Amino acid sequence: MGFIAQFLEMLLAERALSKNSILSYKRDLFDFQNYLAKHKLSELNITTENIRDWIEYLASNDLQARSINRKISTIKSYYEFLISENHTAFNPVLNVDLPKYQNKLPEILSIAQIKSLLEHCSQDNSPEGIRLNAMIHLLYASGLRVSELVSLKLADILTNKTSKGEVRKIFSVLGKGNKERVIVINEQAVISIAKYLTIRGVFVNKAKPRNLIYLFPSSALAGYMTRQNFAILLKSAALYAGLNPEYISPHILRHSFASHLLEGGADLRVIQELLGHADISTTQIYTHLQTNHLKKALLRHPLNKN
């Protein structure tokens, strides 16, 4: 077994990372190894200067600073693993400065734009339209990550009764780091999912038993709709709803969910829990977003001459 395979196996066993995180590590490592091979370098004998050259190479290929930093972090972790396994004694990434980047505020849709998108989707009564309507309603009602949305299982749908005896739908979601959280969804999302469940069988491929367990089954290898396919369908729906598809993505719906909750007075800690953020500082970016919107609103004040 090669060093990379050993490292990925360790990540899977000890850090409980998601499949997507493991794939990201794998891509970064193979890209790095391809660079080393191209420049006739050995991973066990490279210098810090070699690493700086590699970073310059990444930047020259128009890779954003955030992406470069992620790759550096991957390689640094990889060398820490190699040292722990006595394959090398030196981490060439240790004294490398990370490229600086601006922490951009997330893009969001207005409530009016969200309503326009949802109204358009609810008018399509084809099986594909009913499914997409359910997925978009659920995404905006929950703030799920797209990877969490598409991989939901039927068993993740739970029901529970309120103190008034009302039955409501909740979802048990396994997020990053295998951390479980519970999501309660609104009535519109419940209705759209109930409608979808009546036609879900259209998408079940009985020849592939694996897809039977998923809420949004498909013929894809994983057994459920891919993130990429959902993103394409979402952009198409946005176009027909009169919105610019360039500014629509599953992640923007997640940002919109969080921002609109904060705007409505929700506590930041509650939003952190709903989004599945491990650190409150990740959630705090939405407070900066709200401040930004307030500044723009004040600029429109009639007595503001600037």
Swiss-Prot record:
Per the record, the domain of life is Bacteria
Q: Which GO terms describe its molecular function?
A: DNA binding; tyrosine-based site-specific recombinase activity
UniProt signal peptide: none
The active site is formed by: R145, K176, H251, R254, H277, Y286 (o-(3'-phospho-dna)-tyrosine intermediate)
Q: Which InterPro entries match?
A: CB, DNA_brk_join_enz, Integrase-like_cat_sf, Integrase_catalytic, Integrase_recombinase_N, Integrase_SAM-like_N, Recomb_XerD, Tyrosine_recombinase_XerC/XerD
| Keywords (A to Z) from UniProt | Cell cycle, Cell division, Chromosome partition, Cytoplasm, DNA integration, DNA recombination, DNA-binding
Q: Which GO terms describe its biological process?
A: cell division; chromosome segregation; DNA transposition
Q: Where is the Tyr recombinase domain?
A: 104-299
Write down the CDD domains for this protein, in alphabetical order: INT_XerDC_C
Per its database record, what is this protein's job?
Site-specific tyrosine recombinase, which acts by catalyzing the cutting and rejoining of the recombining DNA molecules. The XerC-XerD complex is essential to convert dimers of the bacterial chromosome into monomers to permit their segregation at cell division. It also contributes to the segregational stability of plasmids.
Family matches, as PANTHER family: PHAGE INTEGRASE-RELATED, TYROSINE RECOMBINASE XERC
Q: How does it assemble?
A: Forms a cyclic heterotetrameric complex composed of two molecules of XerC and two molecules of XerD.
User: Which family is this sequence assigned to?
Assistant: Belongs to the 'phage' integrase family. XerD subfamily.
Question: NCBIfam families from the xrefs?
Answer: PRK00283.1
Name the record gives this protein: Tyrosine recombinase XerD
Instruction: Give the organism the record lists.
Output: Rickettsia conorii (strain ATCC VR-613 / Malish 7)
